[in-house]
Structure formats: structure tokens, C-alpha cells
Amino acid sequence: MRINPTTSDPGVSILENKNLGRIAQIIGPVLDVAFPPGKMPNIYNALVVKGRDTLGQEINVTCEVQQLLGNNRVRAVAMSATEGLKRGMDVVDMGTPLSVPVGGATLGRIFNVLGEPVDNLGPVDTRTTSPIHKSAPAFIQLDTKLSIFETGIKVVDLLAPYRRGGKIGLFGGAGVGKTVLIMELINNIAKAHGGVSVFGGVGERTREGNDLYMEMKESGVINEQNLAESKVALVYGQMNEPPGARMRVGLTALTMAEYFRDVNEQDVLLFIDNIFRFVQAGSEVSALLGRMPSAVGYQPTLSTEMGSLQERITSTKKGSITSIQAVYVPADDLTDPAPATTFAHLDATTVLSRGLAAKGIYPAVDPLDSTSTMLQPRIVGEEHYETAQQVKQTLQRYKELQDIIAILGLDELSEEDRLTVARARKIERFLSQPFFVAEVFTGSPGKYVGLAETIRGFKLILSGELDSLPEQAFYLVGNIDEATAKATNL
């Protein structure tokens, strides 16, 4: 982190005494730049291409050095579109890595990968900036306290609870509800949490980014009248951006979150949607950088790139970063190298199932595939642990019996198995829940269910006290009292 002299614009910089090079080759988002002997930039240095295109419009493209090629050439990846660039254009070596604004000035604003505001609300105070490339905190700085982060979502809190200061992954294929779930978590946690949040939109739909911004303004998480009182900073590098921007926008968001943790000593929430696009952007430029592709065409540096990002997301003795990341699963294949590499870094995984989404059970969280390192009796307590295990056993038995039911029907099952199936179907429906952010689609008001209420509800179903109620009564309700009230109206 460094303190800069006041400027009115993050793009303003003194270009004297900088090394000057020229573009030698352009292949899509990748540029080769020739520098004079002895004036070579370092890896990760920012380069700025300045000039005019054929229409006389001003060009200002920032790139990041990735490779030193020999013959006084470097290979760099552009952070914005390279249309209008041509060979021979002047390139300025800024002498430092990309740096972005950090601190209270970022709250309530939307930034691009370079830390420039894109919300038409004027310039940002850039006196305090920080480079996007840093080392992870040292081992002795890490904090190892274990505590649960309550989300108000029944299936998550009961079966795969989140760790405060941990890393959580939401895994799912296309269209099963990752972004809706992340928006609900922002709604439930960011409001109740009271601290600051940073949202990194990595290679997702621009419309969803706009929806999220509007939602945050309506809910007061962003205070338009007094931006300093806002609780969130937004960093977007969406689908239409070049791969360089999508590859680095996650680091920009993380750098802003690290400042709140290390300097302001706060607990921070970091939302990333979608971490797969970070990997995808890396694979897009990897071949252009001359690297041999690895498994399924991914970059050979996949584990290194993921590790350098994920290891910085951690809790220190000063403050914590709790990170919730959506992970797109290509073709619903969890063994694909991108989701498989991400798994290794997470404390809890919430796996979304297309089968449950097809049944209309939302959130479509798979209760048997989702896991958490926090689900241990010494952390969550005996009652929570036992209830969660019984719920999983009941659902597992139901899954085993489904083939028999499909061939022979329910009547061929033993009395005990029929009871298990009936309770499992009630549990499956009770794991659904109306969301605040989906009210406009469903027409049902959203529900926040506390952990104690969640455990009480599932214990009642498992005990058999509610065996007489129809299973429809448990569908899309909050706590168990709502289910019993709904049953009287059916």
C-alpha cells in the first residue's frame, strides 16, 4: 500500500522518466513490446499504450507484463480492448504493478479492473492505493478461531455450515441458481453482518451486475445520499471484457478487501461470482502466451494461479475475510480440473443439483453432496451434529430405495422403509425456502430462519410427530410452525 499525491483522476500519472517501448506484435489481447537494451520492465509491471486510432480518437490501453522474451521484448496482456492499436505505437512502462484505490473511498462505488470508477458518480479519492499482486500473509499471522457464520438458509446452516473467516464455494452448472443464492447470502449476511463487503463480478452477466447494484441501493447497503456510509464496494469485469480484465478483476476486489482487513482491522465479506471465469480467462490467454495446454485444454499453471488468489483470502490476527465464491461446473462435471482445483481450497462446499431444481426445490442445494469442515460435534454441538447426521441418513436411505420404488412401487417396501420415505420427502421439501431476492418471481415473502429454529424443525420431522401432515405443507416455508399452519389450510 502506498500514499499518493492527490490527483483528480486515477489515470493521471507523471510520464517523465519512464521507460518507453514500441508495440512489435499484436495477437488479440496479447501484445509484444520492444524496449531499448537495459530498459526492460519487470514481470507484472503495468504498461500504458497511448496514441490515436485511425479516426483520431484517443487510445489509452493498460497492459500487464507476463513474460520477458529475450531480444529486449516483453509479452503483455491487455486489460481493455485492443482495437485501434497498431505496431510501432509508443508504450510507457509505469515501473510498478497495477495499483487500485483502497479504503473508505471505495465504498458505494463500482470499479473496473484498473480501479477506475464506472458508475458516473465522479472521480474517486486515489491518495491511498495498493498493488494487486501481493504475497499471502505469513503462517504466524494467521488466525485459527473456529466459529459458525449463520446465513438464515436452512439447508446451509444445518448440513454444510459456513465458517467465519473461511472460504465457501457454491458449485453448480448453468441455470441452477448460483447467482440467486449468492445474492440471497449478500442480502442476509451483508445486512446482518454490519461490516463491509466487497463484491467481485468476474466474467458474469452485466445485467446481473446491474440488478445487484439496484438491489443494494434499494436495501440501503449502498447509501446514495452519503456514499461513505455504504457497506459495499463493487468491482466488475463482466463477460464482454477482454480475458486480461477477467483474469485480474478478482485480484482487484481481493486487494480492496485486504485493506479493510489489514489496515482498518475489520471483518470483511468477499463475494466472487464466478471463480470459474477467472480460470477460463487464464486459459484463454495461456495459449497466446505460448504455454502448452494441460488437461482438458486448461493452462498448465492452473493450480499456481488458483493458489496465489485463494491463499490471500484468509483470516489474520487483525481481521478476517470470509469469502463466498460461485463456481460454474462445466457440463455438471465436478471432476473437471477447474472445480476440482477449487475444491482443495474451501472450508465448505454447497453443491447445487439440477435434479432438485427440476423438482422445483429451491435453493437446489444437494444435501448429500454438500460438505463442511465445521460439521463436527465439538464445533456445532451434539444436538446440531446428531440432527444433521440423521437427516443425511434418512435422505441417503431414500436415495437407495428410489430404484426399487421406480420398478415395484411404494407398496412393495417394508413398513419401516415406507415411513423413512415419507419422512425423507418431508425433509426434502422442508429444505426448500422462499428467498428475499426472489420475491418478485415467486410472490412469496422471503424467510430468514435462525439455526435453533432450523434444528427444532428437523428434529420434529425425524421424531415422527409430524407424520400425519401432508408433504406439500413443508414446501417453500420458513420455520416448522409455518408448515403446521399451512397444513391446516390444505
From Swiss-Prot:
Residues that bind ATP: 172-179
Question: At what positions is Phosphothreonine found?
Answer: 6
Localization, UniProt: Plastid, Chloroplast thylakoid membrane
What name is this protein filed under? ATP synthase subunit beta, chloroplastic
The scientific name of the source species is Aethionema cordifolium
What is the protein's quaternary organization?
F-type ATPases have 2 components, CF(1) - the catalytic core - and CF(0) - the membrane proton channel. CF(1) has five subunits: alpha(3), beta(3), gamma(1), delta(1), epsilon(1). CF(0) has four main subunits: a(1), b(1), b'(1) and c(9-12).
Any one GO MF term held by the record is:
ATP binding
What GO cellular component term, any one, is given?
chloroplast thylakoid membrane
Main subcellular location of this protein, as a coarse class: plastid
Q: State its role.
A: Produces ATP from ADP in the presence of a proton gradient across the membrane. The catalytic sites are hosted primarily by the beta subunits.
Q: Which gene encodes it?
A: atpB
What keywords would UniProt list here?
Answer: ATP synthesis, ATP-binding, CF(1), Chloroplast, Hydrogen ion transport, Ion transport, Membrane, Nucleotide-binding, Phosphoprotein, Plastid, Thylakoid, Translocase, Transport
Q: How does the record say this protein sits in the membrane?
A: Peripheral membrane protein
Q: Pfam families per the record?
A: ATP-synt_ab, ATP-synt_ab_N, ATP-synt_VA_C
